[in-house]
Amino acid sequence: IDGYTINTTPQTVKIEYKDQTVTVQYESTTVENTRQKADVSVVKKDSDTENPLDGGKYTLYAGNDIKNYAGQVIVTKGTALETVTTGEDGKASYSVDLPISNGYYIQETQAPYAYIRNSKDVYSFNFNVLPETQAKASFSYTFVNDRTTAKIHIYKVDKESGKAVAQGDASLEGAVYGLYARNDIVHPD
């Protein structure tokens, strides 16, 4: 059966002949096959250092309408199925049980602190029927984020004119400025 692994456990069946007037005696047995599963995970890294990042939130969505065996839509396309948050190792795994023969996609819904959310990076995959000896399909994707940065421009202007040109013999060159943090700055790495 598509979407299930083959059960390789031997089953014993007993059929005996008693005599020609007796109906064949038999015992029934049940054989269960396991439905194939998807192992889905994300990895979060800094775009420059490639160090793992914690605190990134990723949502797994249905990539198409998901139908039951009767053909009825049970989950509409674009529905959020589960959101996970990356740990200190930069990894997160989904626990939702995904139906086979459907498409899915993952998108960042919140960037880690001090990082810019990458809304354009979307990981799409199709969970299709596997060979009957394969119990699980693995899907993993690495997302990267840029740090939030700032640029500071300082201009020296004449006090009286408000222009970047000195008056008379005055000079605007050679000024020394200091930039100080109000709070301690901790590097994310």
Where are these regions (language model features)?
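Solvent-exposed loop/turn and edge beta-strand elements of beta-rich ligand-binding domains
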Residues: 1-189
